[in-house]
């Protein structure tokens, strides 16, 4: 069973061409290497207010229709503040295979066609329907959209606390896992969106939970052969068959990790109809890179000594940075943040920097200047002073004044209590 797992397209008009280039790459790969299932783990759009009559919206529908001509597609709604329930509109997409879009936790089985007329088609069915009609699904999928406090309060009538919600999530996961146990030797895939404890957002920084977070232990209670998740833009294998696909494009300058999608393969023994008789616990997962533009983040502090090499000005430093970036990356962009003294910032020509960088081969460039008052530096002496009298003296020196001894004496008395 081959699954293409992707997420976090974040389609938006300002980055339309870059996003479409990378998502088209996924579809082109699928045409050459047809999967048995597409799993899209949320955040297809960057805003639920994206107009349907935009090139981004049209691209989303076209891409999903193309996928549906190759394999069934399972989608969960992602971050509510981003796309809300807008993916539900994709239920209208049509192809040779059916689509499943979920905004609530639910389980479905995919029953493929078995006769000559229906050989390329199948149907998503609830597990209750499958058991009632005695069907044998090709695989089972548990859809876990990003959990929201509003959902649990409205649906479960429990207190709006993270602890209570975590308990409710435990109940859902355990229940889903128990139901799947009744389908022996049927591959079980989880498609989810949200925050998993221990996930990394960069090489060194762990994600800190600020909303509802699920643990690996909770996910393992689902008894799944594969857990596909979205929300974190850094692709990663978390162990125990749990994966974040990451985003197919770089969302921000400074994202240095590779971008792409996963191709997972679940192995097992099947009958003449392709139904699984037994499942091999070994899972093979390949990360396939997309041609995402490299977005470098350069920070120059003109207020500090050693910002540039001796005899080198700011423009030469920027050129050297661009030369290094262009050696390793064919397609690249750069964000340059320059910190300068407020009285010297006027000497920095942003338009000229942008022109030079584009001439050096950048696809895009953004230059911003942080203006730093010199008084800010002088006031650091006040902050560094240990005692109240010392702070008064430092403040007076900054203003070119002197402090009367009587005031200093009162300061000593105040500090002494």
Please state what every model-predicted region is.
Residues 267-417:
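Accessory, non-catalytic peripheral segments of nucleic-acid enzymes
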Residues 95, 196-198, 202-270:
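Conserved beta-sheet core of the metallophosphoesterase superfamily
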Residues 1-4:
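Extreme N-terminal starter segment of soluble prokaryotic enzymes
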Residues 8, 38, 43, 60-63, ...:
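Divalent metal-coordination and catalytic microenvironments
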Residues 12-14, 46-49, 76-90, 108-111, ...:
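Active-site environment of divalent metal-dependent phosphoester hydrolases
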Residues 14-116, 121-126, 130, 216-224:
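Core catalytic region of metal-dependent phosphoesterases/phosphodiesterases
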Residues 14-19, 49-54, 155, 202-204, ...:
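Short, solvent-exposed loop/turn segments at secondary-structure boundaries
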């Amino acid at each position: 069973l081959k699954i293409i797992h992707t997420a976090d397209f974040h389609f938006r008009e300002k980055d339309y061409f870059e996003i479409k280039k990378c998502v088209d790459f996924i579809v082109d790969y699928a045409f050459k290497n047809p999967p048995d299932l597409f799993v899209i783990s949320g955040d297809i759009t960057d805003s639920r207010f994206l107009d349907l009559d935009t090139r981004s919206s049209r691209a989303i529908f076209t891409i999903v229709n193309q996928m549906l001509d190759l394999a069934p597609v399972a989608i969960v709604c992602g971050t509510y503040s981003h796309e809300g329930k807008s993916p539900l509109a994709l239920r209208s997409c049509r192809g040779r295979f059916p689509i499943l879009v979920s905004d609530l936790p639910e389980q479905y089985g995919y029953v493929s066609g078995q006769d000559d007329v229906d050989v390329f088609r199948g149907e998503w069915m609830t597990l209750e329907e499958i058991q009632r009609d005695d069907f044998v699904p090709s695989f089972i999928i548990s859809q876990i959209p990003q959990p929201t406090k509003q959902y649990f309060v409205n649906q479960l009538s429990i207190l709006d606390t993270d602890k209570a919600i975590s308990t409710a999530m435990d109940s859902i996961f355990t229940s889903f896992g128990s139901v799947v146990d009744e389908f022996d030797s049927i591959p079980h895939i989880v498609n989810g969106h949200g925050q998993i404890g221990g996930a990394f957002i960069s090489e060194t920084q762990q994600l800190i939970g600020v909303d509802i977070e699920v643990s690996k232990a909770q996910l393992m209670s689902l008894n799944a052969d594969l857990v596909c998740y979205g929300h974190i833009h850094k692709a990663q294998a978390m162990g125990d068959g749990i994966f974040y696909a990451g985003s197919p494009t770089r969302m921000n300058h400074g994202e240095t990790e590779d971008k792409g999608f996963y191709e997972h393969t679940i192995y097992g023994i099947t009958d003449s109809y392709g139904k699984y008789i037994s499942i091999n616990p070994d899972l093979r997962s390949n990360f396939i890179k997309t041609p995402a533009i490299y977005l470098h983040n350069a920070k120059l502090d003109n207020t500090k000594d050693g910002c540039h090499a001796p005899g080198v000005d700011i423009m030469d430093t920027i050129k050297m940075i661009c030369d290094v970036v262009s050696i390793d990356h064919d397609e690249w962009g750069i964000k340059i943040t320059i910190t300068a003294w407020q009285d010297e910032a006027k000497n920095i020509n942003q338009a000229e920097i942008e022109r030079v960088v584009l001439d050096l081969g950048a696809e895009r460039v953004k230059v911003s200047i942080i203006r730093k008052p010199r008084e800010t530096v002088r006031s650091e002496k006040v902050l560094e002073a240990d005692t109240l009298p010392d702070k008064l003296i430092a403040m007076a020196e900054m203003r070119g004044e002197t402090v009367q001894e009587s005031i200093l004496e009162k300061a000593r008395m105040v500090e002494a209590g």
